[in-house]
Amino acid sequence: MEKQTAIPLRERNIILIGFMGAGKTTIGQLVAKKLYRDFIDVDAEIERRQGMSIPEIFAQKGEAYFRKVERELIVDLCTNTRLKILSLGGGAYLQEEVRRACLAHGIVFFLDLSWDYWKEERLPLIVDSRPVLKNKTLEEVEQLFFQRQSAYALHHSRVVINELEAEQAADQIVESIKWMWDVYEPNR
């Protein structure tokens, strides 16, 4: 059996998870700039590779196909790349294989926000662009929000982003990462 070498903490991908519309892409881009790393939005990368938008993939090929492509891409990025900032789609982390790969090979940050804040501030901005929200009542979306919390609870660090500007959230993540590096891999 081949022994896998652990990825040094400073070289691990930094992975942002959280509910749709939490700001993973915006915050991820800022973190990438601050740490001089490449940024990969998993949904945008899927769209690029598939040659169609996420809503088109859902409509033409179905959610199961999308989740398979998403899972394969994330596992590949986690196991075969380093020094990246990855922004996962809101439902990606619900897949056990994705969670295992992210936790084993990356540093996972959960961008957390309250239901009330999300409903008032974020939902109006994204309601028409997310296939998962299509034809759902507010009660069904609330149920989805809370169902996903148990998967999101499996992370390395959490940033509560209610009322935070994207820049402030990015600064908190960078400070947390640098602290981890200093504590767990000093003098590198």
From Swiss-Prot:
Cofactor binding note of this UniProt entry: Binds 1 Mg(2+) ion per subunit.
One GO BP: amino acid biosynthetic process
Record-linked InterPro entries: P-loop_NTPase, Shikimate/glucono_kinase, Shikimate_kinase/TSH1
Gene3D superfamilies: P-loop containing nucleotide triphosphate hydrolases
Catalytic activity: shikimate + ATP = 3-phosphoshikimate + ADP + H(+)
The keyword Magnesium appears for this protein: yes
One GO cellular component, as annotated: cytosol
Annotated ATP binding sites: G21, A22, G23, K24, T25, T26, R130
Keyword tags: Amino-acid biosynthesis, Aromatic amino acid biosynthesis, ATP-binding, Cytoplasm, Kinase, Magnesium, Metal-binding, Nucleotide-binding, Transferase
Annotated pathway: Metabolic intermediate biosynthesis; chorismate biosynthesis; chorismate from D-erythrose 4-phosphate and phosphoenolpyruvate: step 5/7
Nucleotide-binding in keyword set: yes
GO MF annotation: an example: shikimate kinase activity
Residues reported in the UniProt entry to bind substrate: D43, R67, G90, R148
Localization in the cell: Cytoplasm
The protein's required cofactors: Mg(2+)
UniProt-annotated binding residues for Mg(2+): T25
Predominant location: cytoplasm
EC annotation from Swiss-Prot or TrEMBL: 2.7.1.71
The family this protein is said to belong to: Belongs to the shikimate kinase family.
Assembly, per entry: Monomer.
PANTHER family, sorted: SHIKIMATE KINASE, SHIKIMATE KINASE 1, CHLOROPLASTIC
HAMAP family reported in the protein's UniProt record: Shikimate_kinase
Protein purpose: Catalyzes the specific phosphorylation of the 3-hydroxyl group of shikimic acid using ATP as a cosubstrate.
Name this protein carries in UniProt: Shikimate kinase
Organism: Geobacillus thermodenitrificans (strain NG80-2)
